[in-house]
């Protein structure tokens, strides 16, 4: 049994399976689960130094919406509020950093996201599999968990 599980979610259908797998790894003890959602920077992929204020406002709004959605997503699972993280940055990098900060034993992540992010989350899972300092459990889209 793992004592600290970091579950990375993107609000896809697979995310519920990720959380269910995390619960199983902790014998249904939500106090051992840390939940993270990473928001990509609004300016990622652009080299724009103009309109930074507008992008910052958009990014702040995206973080607020993601945080509210994350709270709603986990509301029935009773994960402590101080163990729920909404961060901005590179998905794999932020998940690894949070994993190190909380000294997680395992990361649970979906192997595919939703819509246009399907390939990106696959890339994130791959980066974590090859760069994490702890165990990584990937939950495939469509797994009945």
Regions found by a protein language model. Name each.
Residues 1-17, 79, 131-145:
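Intrinsically disordered or low-complexity boundary/linker segments at protein termini
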Residues 23, 71, 126-127:
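Active-site phosphate/pyrophosphate- and oxyanion-stabilizing loops and adjacent acidic/basic residues
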Residues 53-65:
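A short acidic, glycine-rich active-site loop
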Residues 74-107, 145:
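Structural beta-alpha unit
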């Amino acid at each position: 049994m793992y004592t600290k599980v970091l579950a990375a979610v993107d609000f896809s259908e697979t995310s519920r399976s990720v959380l269910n797998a995390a619960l199983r790894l902790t014998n249904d003890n939500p106090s051992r689960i840390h939940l993270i959602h990473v928001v990509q920077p609004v300016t990622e992929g652009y080299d724009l130094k103009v309109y930074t204020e507008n992008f910052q406002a958009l990014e702040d709004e995206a973080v607020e919406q993601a945080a509210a959605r994350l709270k709603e997503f986990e509301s029935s699972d009773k994960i402590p509020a101080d163990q729920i993280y909404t961060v901005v940055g590179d998905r794999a990098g932020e998940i690894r950093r949070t994993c190190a900060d909380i000294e997680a034993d395992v990361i649970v992540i979906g192997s595919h996201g939703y819509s246009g992010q399907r390939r990106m989350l696959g890339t994130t899972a791959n980066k974590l599999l090859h760069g994490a300092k702890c165990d990584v459990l990937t939950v495939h889209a469509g797994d009945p968990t």
